[in-house]
Amino acid sequence: FSAQETPAASAEGSLFDAPAYQTIDTVPHVYHTVTDEKALRELAGRLEASSEFCFDTETTGFDVFGDRLVGLSFAVEPFEAWYVPCDPANLGQVLSILRPVFENERIAKIGQNVKFDLMMLRSAGIDVRGTLYDTMIVHYLLDPESRHGMDHLARICLNYSPVPIEELIGKGARQITMDRVPVAPGTRPRTPT
């Protein structure tokens, strides 16, 4: 380079620059835990009034035939979400209240690895209808050579680093299933510090 020329700044940054991801502690959000029928019916009404919503199933594992549904999570707007714990005692009531929402063809449903969620819900007696968007498939179509897991997509698309699943359930010999995770830590409301 001559004295007047300087190399262009790299858009990728330095090899040693770590991206500053947003986290659950830096992004204002409201997470609701649905613990009674009134709150569940209010959530169902809100989902029914929307043109689309995001959802996820929480299960005791990845075996559609052997594991069970232990929770459902939903989002309609950014930075607000609901978690509905499902234990054997309330599962029938939860599913009967949410079935019309899942089976409403007018409402689009969005998720990550939706095929698994659809199979879990079908095994629980719900036939999800309407337009489906699977963020994992969409990302695969856009970038087939990359990883497509939810944590990776959150980092590259949203500049957000989710709470690692290991922080909730542990790993190895001490790993627990999602039905044994205390609900409050997963739905803690926060404002950034």
Where are these regions (language model features)?
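Active-site-proximal helix-loop-helix substrate-binding element of RNase H-like nuclease domains
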Residues: 23-31, 67-193
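Long, highly charged low-complexity segments
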Residues: 1-72, 86-101
